[in-house]
């Protein structure tokens, strides 16, 4: 009987673990005709650190990621965010309550990284930040940058450009965000499974205005 109970418990444990496995999320095509004009978006851009208790819709998430660092010229694979010598060194990690994903710009989808909610690690000691439904974390990949002498500054600049894309998009469609460089980097490196040569640069929590 004891052996049977052990088998039953093990079976349900496996089912539970499988139920927690993340699946690839196919994003919607971006709606390119939405939002304020470019000049109005610049006028409205400001930092906000409070969000409504509501998840982003799939369409808003899809548009946000495309604006951040999506492909806007499919024939060449070039991005909405320029990068040093077009090396496309910036990866965007999408941190949510359900877990963390890596944005695949070519497929315009989210690839699972971990089922752990890492928003508190991104927020560090600023606990209110962890309440944002989505936090985008920009990571540079130094090996992609051929000019190793300037890789540090190039990676930082490229990450900042993606962050600014996020800020302008949010201003243009009425979402709330704030660019931040503070995060628990050592813990995040482990959770995001970063390799040598990958560096956390900046993050943008995003949500609906409260």
Where are these regions (language model features)?
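Short, small-residue-rich loop/turn micro-motifs
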Residues: 31, 138-142, 208
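Conserved active-site beta-strand-loop modules that form the wall/rim of enzyme catalytic pockets
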Residues: 10, 99, 132-138
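Bacterial Sec-dependent N-terminal signal peptides
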Residues: 1-22
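Short secondary-structure capping/junction motifs at helix and strand boundaries
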Residues: 3-4, 75-78, 175-176
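N-terminal amphipathic, basic helical "cap/leader" segment at the start of enzyme domains
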Residues: 20-132
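Small-aliphatic-rich amphipathic alpha-helix that forms the alpha element of a beta-alpha
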Residues: 45, 64, 92, 134-188
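A glycine-rich helix N-cap at a beta->alpha junction
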Residues: 193-210
């Amino acid at each position: 009987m004891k052996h049977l109970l052990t088998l039953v418990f093990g079976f349900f444990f496996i089912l539970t673990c499988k139920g927690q496995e993340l699946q690839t999320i196919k994003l919607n095509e971006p709606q390119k005709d939405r939002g304020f004009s470019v000049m109005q978006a610049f006028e409205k851009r400001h930092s906000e650190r409070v969000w409504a208790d509501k998840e982003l819709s799939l369409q808003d998430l899809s548009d946000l990621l495309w604006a951040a660092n999506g492909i806007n010229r499919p024939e060449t694979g070039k991005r909405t965010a320029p990068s040093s010598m077009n090396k496309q060194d910036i990866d965007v990690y999408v941190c949510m309550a359900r877990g963390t994903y890596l944005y695949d710009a070519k497929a315009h989808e989210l690839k699972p990284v971990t089922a752990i909610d890492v928003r508190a690690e991104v927020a560090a000691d600023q606990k209110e930040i962890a309440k944002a439904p989505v936090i985008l974390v920009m990571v540079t990949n130094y090996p992609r940058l051929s000019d190793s002498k300037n890789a540090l500054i190039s990676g930082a600049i490229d990450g900042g450009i993606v962050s600014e894309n996020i800020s302008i998009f949010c201003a243009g469609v009425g979402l709330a965000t704030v660019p931040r460089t503070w995060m628990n980097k050592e813990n995040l490196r482990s959770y995001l499974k970063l390799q040598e040569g990958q560096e956390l640069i900046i993050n943008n929590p995003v949500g609906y205005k409260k």
